[in-house]
Amino acid sequence: MSLNLFSSSVLRNVATTANVGLSISRSSSTAAMSAFTSQRNTGSQGSNVLQRRRLPSRLKYLEDQKVQGESRALERFQSREFQAGDVYAPHDLSPAEMKKWGRRKSPRTDAFDALNLNPLDMYKNFAVMSEYMTSMGRIKPRSQTGLRPVNQRKLAKALRRAIGMGLMPSVHRHPEIIASEMRAQSIWAASPSTTRGQPTQLSSDAKGERLAYASNKSIFLRSIDDPAVARQYTEHKAQTTVARFAPSGFYVASGDAAGIVRVWDCVGEGITKGEYSIVNGRINDLAWDGDSQRIIAVGDGKQRYGHCITWDSGNTVGEIHGHTQQLNTVSIRQQRPLRAATAGDDRKTVFYHGAPFKFNMGIADKHSNYIYGVQFSPDGSHLVSVGADRKIWLYDGKTGETKGQIGEGEHNGSIFGVSWAKDSRKFVTASADRTVKIWDVEAGKATQTWTLGEEGAMAVRDHQVGVVWPPGRSDDLLISLSLSGDLNYLVEGTPKPRQVVSGHQKSITSLNQTTVDNKETLWTGSFDGRVCNWDVATGTAEEIEGEGHPGYVAGLATTSEGSGRIYSVGWDDTVRSIDASAKTYTGSASKLNGQPKGIAAGDVTVLVGESEAVEIYQDGKKTGEYKTDFAATTVAAHGSMAAVGGENGSVQICAISSSRLSPRADISASRNPISSLAFSPDASHLAVGDLRGRVLVFKVSDGSLVTDRWTAHTARITSLAWNPTGSHVVSGSLDTNIFVWSLAKPGDWVELQNAHKEGVHGVAWVDGGVKIVSVGADAAVKKWKVDGLQ
């Protein structure tokens, strides 16, 4: 039996079976048939068993071969010519055409080869990207680009990079085709973020024109001469802590609470040049060397407290050693030989020689408490250190030798900041005793003192937690930072601040706009309870004085009482009034029955929405209450009309009287909770925004739907506003985007993406309806110009 199993006929059958699927000729099918016939005549029992097992698959193979043979006879009469760009499927091609298609030739050289350019380097070139980009943000096919496959792939990668970095729009249209657009006109920056008992770092460029500081998750570069002009960097994912200009003035290095340092272009488009993980904790300070090549960043980490790197590659150029607790400050000598100094909570000042930077010596017997600031003088001859023990120590900038202590007993609080004058003969300090002092190095005493805040008051908000003496200026200006976030412009020789720049430190949660005597004013409230008014023409802000809300401001509304009155509600469950002309709180707070969901005002009536009712106020006093059949989420008013939105997606339109609301119509607006409402200027239409990002418009007269096509937002609608003519609606959302919608052409809109980091909280029209202002979680107020509305 074993001989029969390995007979020649069986071997031929096995060989034929192994070649099934590889042969597609008619000869192979004939050989297979002969092998099958030969095997069937074999008398061996084992061979018959093997035959029966393989019979079904063999028959199927033979049938497939027969079908293929018949189809080839028809191919002669079904030839088809294909051109480049035709839509086809592989099974449409004959074998001959498939071979021809597979032999198509690609160009050996193309435009990039001729010009010796790398397509990957072209991602910044808008003209090149536009030439090779389709209207849907994709690269054009090779039949149109004429590129080699390698360069085609490289250019596609460059295009994806440009879109990812925001250099190219994902849906591209040439500028001449764009009929309407929205662009930033000005950014009214947030105030620096501060923490009680901690220093806040300020930095100025070499020309003394711009100020850099950290606020929330952004970095702001602010004009010193015109604080209404600013630039915002938003690439950090965590709370930002420090920002420093490079001596060259072309780059900024910034750190955050996650231990990340980012280096970015501060002259061009703000492109990030590098991102480096320094410590696994908070970055407290960083410093550049005089060549703008090396950075030392320090903070609070578990494995190390700082690191030295090159800004362009992140390569290590030294180690930070000699400390046992977190570091608060660092400085690098700008002259050679390079020196560096660090200090922190371990009360020790450590000197390094570089580069690469290595430990040289540590001084632990001078300060008796935390050290908050060290800085080399511009000429490199001195080093000064200050701290929570209220002491000021001077050292030799080259050797680290201690020169002595000055100003003992002058400051009555922790010294949080120090900065040198450009002549290296004087420096300035900022302290928690509310004072800023200028010191003469040679005399060893203070030459001028400013006391910030009200006379005789020791308000915590007036603690001075940071200071910078901008170089390159001829007016002897220095800038100090209060714990409240106010920037104080101080000029040597003058007793009072020349200017105080105010703003918001926390997320702006509410916005209202008023116009009195053709002067437009914005009113903003923030998460920490601060309310400010802004001059739209100049972009300057003033904080409202008096006893306000201790926390979250949930809404602002305007009435025509007297010379104008602003009403505010907060999460302290109170409603308060503000005299618009005096810019101060008036009267006492009125207690609400529950947490406010929103506030709106008619001519003289104020409505405060709560979960179970709408409270009615006149002249600061409660006059009535309206119980709703649903849980109220928002409220709007215009003249004698009011609208209440509910958790169930319904909107109730009511008439306002002095003490009650009279229902007029019920609208089933959405399946989702209503989040925002706005009446048109003539009260003929009502715009409705819901929790899922939809915006709808209804007629007030009969509740009929006008449009439900405005669905581009992807998160809760936080604010809606009509332009003065009632033709367009602007919407803001937690998705960070702003849209301008056309009532006449519901399918047309203008989009502004990433208007505010982490969400837009308020929008309004200004300057006659040609510009928009917005506020958001980044604590900034931004003005946008809208062109070509239809």
Ranges and model annotations:
Residues 1-49:
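N-terminal mitochondrial targeting presequence
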Residues 36-143, 153, 157-181:
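Mature, matrix/stroma-exposed regions of nuclear-encoded mitochondrial and chloroplast proteins
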Residues 182-197, 226-228:
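A short helix->beta-strand "capping" segment at the edge of beta-propeller domains
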Residues 192-197, 234-240, 276-283, 321-327, ...:
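WD40/WD-repeat beta-propeller blade N-cap
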Residues 202-208, 244-249, 287-293, 330-338, ...:
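Loop/turn segments within WD40 beta-propeller blades
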Residues 215, 255-258, 298-302, 342-346, ...:
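Conserved strand-to-loop turn within each blade of WD40 beta-propeller repeats
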Residues 219-223, 261-265, 306-311, 349-354, ...:
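WD40-repeat beta-propellers
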Residues 760-790:
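Blade-level signature of beta-propeller repeat domains, shared across WD40, Kelch, NHL, RCC1
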